[in-house]
Amino acid sequence: MSGGTPYIGSKISLISKAEIRYEGILYTIDTENSTVALAKVRSFGTEDRPTDRPIPPRDEVFEYIIFRGSDIKDLTVCEPPKPQCSLPQDPAIVQSSLGSSSSSFQSVGSYGPFGRMPAYSQFSPSTLVGQQFGAVGVAGNSLTSFGTEASNSGTLSQSNAVGSAFTQDTRSVKPQLAQGRSSPQLDPLRKSPTMEQAVQTASAHLPAPAPVGRRSPVPARPLPPTSQKAIDNQEHRRAEVHKVPRPENEQLRNDKRQVVPGVPSAPRRGRGGHRGGRGRFGIRRDGPMKFEKDFDFESANAQFNKEEIDREFHNKLKLKEDKLEKQEKPVNGEDKGDSGVDTQNSEGNADEEDPLGPNCYYDKTKSFFDNISCDDNRERRPTWAEERRLNAETFGIPLRPNRGRGGYRGRGGLGFRGGRGRGSGRGGTFTAPRGFRAGFRGARGGREFADFEYRKTTAFGP
């Protein structure tokens, strides 16, 4: 093989010391490590050669196998390399590329996935040796077709010297031997000392594996390693996105709400505060309040002046009593003693006058009930004016009288006594007497409750 003949691309028949014959295309020859690489290799087994461990032939076609030179028993050239169809020496041609063909070897200028290696169009992907050796940038995965990779790459050039170009590229085989995954299909091949020593020798001279990148003829730039600090900062920023409010969006919303001068703005129904809030009021984003120490009740109570509070409370009670006395007048000639129950209650209150004064709000020896929640110490019937005022405060003032139906339901009084109801019927106004519960139709009140004392004012409508 030293006669200057370019054997690269020739079909080689190789017999190892284990009496196993291989056939493949000569890929590279590494003179430094004394290794030979064959592509598109097929194993024919030991055939009829005498050996202690016969191995049957295999139908698989391996992408490439690297053999140690000292373990090769015989090596013969079966077919010379096919002639290359090169373009004529035309100064107008700057760059050219050949498409994928069915030939066993392409142009020297067609680079494969290893940077400066020839591309083979007919190499079928095999998972056997590809998983054993792997390739730089693939990290253990099986190699794809060299012709496909070469056709996809855009930087292809033409070369004339076939032998010299591949002689310079023999050192580029070493990065191919990246450690990859093993396959059970390689068990018969591992028994061969040629294969084992070739793998050991190649792995011993392996440089540091390059970072994984795209399979292209252009050397991939190694990506800087991502530090843990950068990852933590990125996660922290993502967490702050959900916590920090967005003042810019709120400002834009406020700017959109500004009304143009001279144009009246239509009233809008807010959904819980503002229109863009989606039912949210002024939600505190600061989180729950944190108290540094317990609440001091003694210092808080010392800030209040109990005497002033009691004095203000008694003044309010006196004002209420004066107003109630002025409003208590007999209505329709009725005296307070119309009801025997009221007379009895008033007498009981007179007898049970509080001897301790107004400051004693609760005396458990005297009664179970207290005097705090009671506005008036005397049991009495609510007057018509007071009941009307309570009804107006509770239900509101009607805009106009309803014709044919009762106005509004009266407020219930104390104990079992009913409130006062007003109903407006057709053609008249009916006022229910005391003791009657409100809520009936005014038009029927005059007929159904004729036995009660009532005041009826007849008014003729339009």
From Swiss-Prot:
Q: Which UniProt keywords apply?
A: Acetylation, Cytoplasm, Cytoskeleton, Developmental protein, Methylation, Phosphoprotein, Repressor, Ribonucleoprotein, Translation regulation
**The UniProt record lists the keyword Iron:** no
- GO biological process annotation, one example: positive regulation of type I interferon-mediated signaling pathway
The listed location of motif FFD box is: 360-376
Location of the motif TFG box: 379-399
Residues where N-acetylserine occurs?
Answer: 2
What SUPFAM superfamilies does the record tag this protein with? Sm-like ribonucleoproteins
Q: Does the keyword Oxidoreductase belong to this entry?
A: no
Cited SMART domains: FDF, LSM14
| Cellular-component GO terms for this entry | cytoplasm; cytoplasmic stress granule; cytosol; mitotic spindle; P-body; ribonucleoprotein complex
Residues annotated with Asymmetric dimethylarginine modification:
400
Question: Modified residue Phosphothreonine is at which positions?
Answer: 194
Q: Which residues cross the membrane?
A: none
Record's subcellular location = Cytoplasm, P-body; Cytoplasm, Cytoskeleton, Spindle; Cytoplasm, Stress granule
Instruction: Provide the GO MF annotations for this entry.
Output: double-stranded DNA binding; double-stranded RNA binding; single-stranded RNA binding
Annotated spans, Disordered: 149-287, 321-358, 397-439
Q: Where is the composition biased (Basic and acidic residues)?
A: 232-258, 321-339
Q: Spell out the Gly residues composition-biased ranges.
A: 409-428
* UniProt free text on domains: The LSM14 domain and the RGG repeats are required for accumulation in P-bodies, and the region containing the FDF motif is responsible for cytoplasmic retention.
Query: What does the similarity note say?
Result: Belongs to the LSM14 family.
Summary of the function given for this chain in its UniProt record: Essential for formation of P-bodies, cytoplasmic structures that provide storage sites for translationally inactive mRNAs and protect them from degradation. Acts as a repressor of mRNA translation. May play a role in mitotic spindle assembly.
Tell me the protein's name.
Protein LSM14 homolog A
The taxonomy runs: Eukaryota, Metazoa, Chordata, Craniata, Vertebrata
Name the gene behind this protein.
Lsm14a
